[in-house]
Amino acid sequence: MDIIGIGYMGFETANLDAWREYGPQVMGFGVGKSPDSDLESLYFRIDDRRHRFAFHPGRVDRLAYIGWEAVGRMAFEAGLRKLEAAGVEFVRGDTAFCELRGVREVVRFRDPVGYQYELFYGQKWTPRSFIPGRPHTGFLADERGAGHVVVITPEYTPELERFLLDVMGFHWYGAGAGKGRTGFFRAKLNDKTSHDIAYGHGPGRMGVQHVGLFVRNVRDVGETYDIVRKRELPMMMTLGQHSQDPHLSFYHFTPSGFAFETIAEIEPWQGDPYELNPETLSLWGHEMVGPILGPSVRTPEEVLDAEYLAGKKR
């Protein structure tokens, strides 16, 4: 599929009030206008798109959906044919649902693990409209997508890899330097970053491990790092640089229990002409000062929505 990357992500949270302050004041997100049909939810902006992250009221903190952006209508329709040929069931969003997401067209379907995917094109935007919630030089999104996400899967199966590689058309990036079974994947049209999504094997567990966001300046990483430390927010990894990409980053936990990785490019990503097998996760730093799996990672029964669980029981 001709996919740019992740266009948006949606979460359910029992901590909306915490996100109202945390999003703008810690991360520098702009606060978007909630649709009239979803006034209870919180919509965040990191660029001129109508929104990139949505937080909906929920009983537990969990990933609700990942919106994958097709480059345009022709690519979207080709993607639907790909889903049909693979026997993947999908549901088209009606006019009201498209307006809710702020897109021209959208379909919903599941990956083999049960995570909710959406494929869309034509997200609403307003030029030069992004205003950060605090002094911040801004985020890198646009042609690379909103960022990357690492999710946990209770079973890492060949079916999952076939779905990601053959149906979604993602590129295989590698297994990283972790100790467990992990796969990193990149959308077909993303040539700016190493991966858009990774699946890590955690027997009996599901949920978001972390979300990675690129900022425009090293200063944004440093200032966010200072804010996190001054507020004594829980951290996963200290400032450091991974072995496989020339980026500076650190990880800290959000009010929903998953981590944000705040990333600045030291130099452009070098591409992946061959698969690497790094000896260590990082060249320097990235000291593990918190759990690798936060409270956002739970049992599948806690993380999956009721509709999906009911369908599995039938």
Question: What are these model-derived regions, one by one?
Answer:
Residues 33-71, 92-96:
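Conserved donor-binding loop and adjoining core beta-sheet/short helix segment
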Residues 177, 182-246:
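A compositional/structural signature marking long, glycine- and acidic/polar-rich segments
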Residues 1-17, 63-66, 124-158, 206-213, ...:
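N-terminal beta-strand motif that seeds the catalytic metal site of vicinal oxygen chelate
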Residues 1-51, 151-194:
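Core segments of cupin and vicinal oxygen chelate
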Residues 49-54, 114-117, 191-196, 257-259:
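Short, charged/polar, Gly/Pro-enriched secondary-structure boundary elements
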Residues 19-24, 83, 114, 159-165, ...:
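Conserved active-site tyrosine of GNAT-family acetyltransferases
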Residues 5-14, 58-155, 183-188, 232-314, ...:
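Vicinal oxygen chelate
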